[in-house]
């Protein structure tokens, strides 16, 4: 059924298709129909960050930026759902067109630019949702906030989403907000992590529960840079790392239509880069911090490869666009088939 739906949706522009799909998934969730459209994955419970996940396959941030279809995505069988990226104030993002499909490579290029309706709108939607599973909320900075003031934006968002999130992801790796990726390095990263850790402690006291913080990083780092990031995460007491966001590289899509468009590349071509980052992180973190792997999962075996590389959880986005809900169950099954010692 999804193959037919995809053929129809792919006749529309990528952003129109995205918006329509989100509307349909949201409507299906409100009516309780989405569970009928896909076979639920087997139970494969896992405990990560002190949270209990029914299975280790989640929805990556970016597909549902405003929390418009939380219940709908949950009914498709995801073990957890991450929404956002959300910013303190609503913003339109970059000019259209800003999403480009590369179907021959099972890839997508986007330069959305954190288009969203603002954190207050997202919180109201989370409050209205029926979903009571693991919900991640991904936070970022507004386009017009200077990088040197970025910490303020992250703290504003953290304050507002804390009571509503199972965990919070700090996005410092989107390539579509100027200067954002500089926050992954050196003193900028240390200052951000320190501020977040202090605020997390304050909010834990205020709300009576500790909400884990995850940092989402880019795949375009050297091994040396990745090692330094790992050290900073351990030192600051962060709870998890998500590896990875989209890449600026065009390796694997050279010469394809739209390959020269600006933006972050996701999907199959980023798989090896992302998995390499997971391996480097796993070697450096040595189990002290869980890894959530994202990037290039278009088949179940790719999810298993991420777990084998050292991840505790995986997330899908572009693969979901190309393969539909069946990829969730396929990924859970592939992970379940791994020897227990390997997962």
From Swiss-Prot:
FMN binds at residues 61-65, 85, 138, 171, 216, 244, 267, 296, 317-318. Its EC number is 1.3.5.2. GO terms for biological process: 'de novo' pyrimidine nucleobase biosynthetic process; 'de novo' UMP biosynthetic process. Its cofactor is FMN. The active site is at 174 (nucleophile). One of its GO terms (cellular component) is plasma membrane. One of its GO terms (molecular function) is dihydroorotate dehydrogenase (quinone) activity. It is an enzyme of class 1 (oxidoreductase). Keywords: Cell membrane, Flavoprotein, FMN, Membrane, Oxidoreductase, Pyrimidine biosynthesis. It comes from the Bacteria. It is found in: Cell membrane. Substrate binds at residues 65, 110-114, 171, 176, 245-246. Pfam families: DHO_dh. InterPro entries: Aldolase_TIM, DHO_dehydrogenase, Dihydroorotate_DH_1_2, Dihydroorotate_DH_2, Dihydroorotate_DH_cat, Dihydroorotate_DH_CS. PROSITE patterns: DHODEHASE_1. It is a peripheral membrane protein. It catalyses: (S)-dihydroorotate + a quinone = orotate + a quinol. Pathway: Pyrimidine metabolism; UMP biosynthesis via de novo pathway; orotate from (S)-dihydroorotate (quinone route): step 1/1. Binds 1 FMN per subunit. CDD domains: DHOD_2_like. Catalyzes the conversion of dihydroorotate to orotate with quinone as electron acceptor. HAMAP family: DHO_dh_type2. Belongs to the dihydroorotate dehydrogenase family. Type 2 subfamily. Monomer. This is Dihydroorotate dehydrogenase (quinone).
């Amino acid at each position: 059924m999804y193959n037919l739906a995809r053929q129809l949706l792919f006749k529309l522009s990528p952003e129109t298709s995205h918006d329509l799909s989100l509307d349909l998934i949201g409507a299906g969730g409100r009516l309780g129909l989405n569970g009928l459209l896909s076979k639920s994955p087997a139970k494969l419970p896992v405990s990560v960050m002190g949270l209990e996940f029914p299975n280790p396959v989640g929805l990556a941030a970016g597909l549902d930026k405003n929390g418009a279809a939380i219940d709908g995505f949950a009914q498709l069988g995801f073990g957890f759902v991450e929404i956002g990226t959300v910013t303190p104030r609503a913003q339109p993002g970059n000019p259209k067109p800003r999403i480009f499909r590369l179907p021959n490579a099972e890839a997508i290029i986007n330069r959305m630019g954190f288009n969203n309706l603002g954190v207050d709108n997202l919180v109201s939607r989370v409050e209205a949702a029926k979903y009571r599973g693991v919900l991640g909320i991904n936070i970022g900075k507004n386009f017009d906030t200077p990088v040197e003031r970025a910490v303020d934006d992250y703290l504003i968002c953290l304050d507002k989403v804390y009571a509503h999130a199972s965990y919070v992801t700090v996005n410092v790796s989107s390539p579509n907000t100027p200067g954002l990726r500089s926050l992954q390095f050196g003193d900028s990263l240390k200052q951000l992590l320190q501020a977040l850790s202090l605020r997390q402690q304050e909010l834990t006291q205020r709300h009576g529960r500790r909400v884990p913080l995850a940092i989402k990083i880019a795949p375009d780092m050297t091994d040396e840079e990745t090692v330094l990031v790992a050290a900073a995460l351990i030192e600051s007491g962060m709870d998890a790392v998500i590896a990875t966001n989209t890449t600026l590289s065009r390796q694997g899509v050279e010469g394809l239509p739209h390959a020269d468009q600006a933006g972050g590349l996701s999907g199959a071509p980023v798989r090896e880069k992302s998995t390499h980052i997971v391996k480097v992180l796993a070697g450096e973190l040595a189990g002290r911090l869980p890894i959530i792997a994202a990037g290039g999962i278009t088949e179940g075996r790719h999810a298993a490869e991420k777990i084998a590389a050292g991840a505790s959880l995986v997330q899908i986005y572009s693969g979901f666009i190309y393969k539909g809900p069946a990829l969730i169950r396929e990924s859970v099954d592939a992970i379940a088939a791994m020897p227990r010692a390997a997962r």
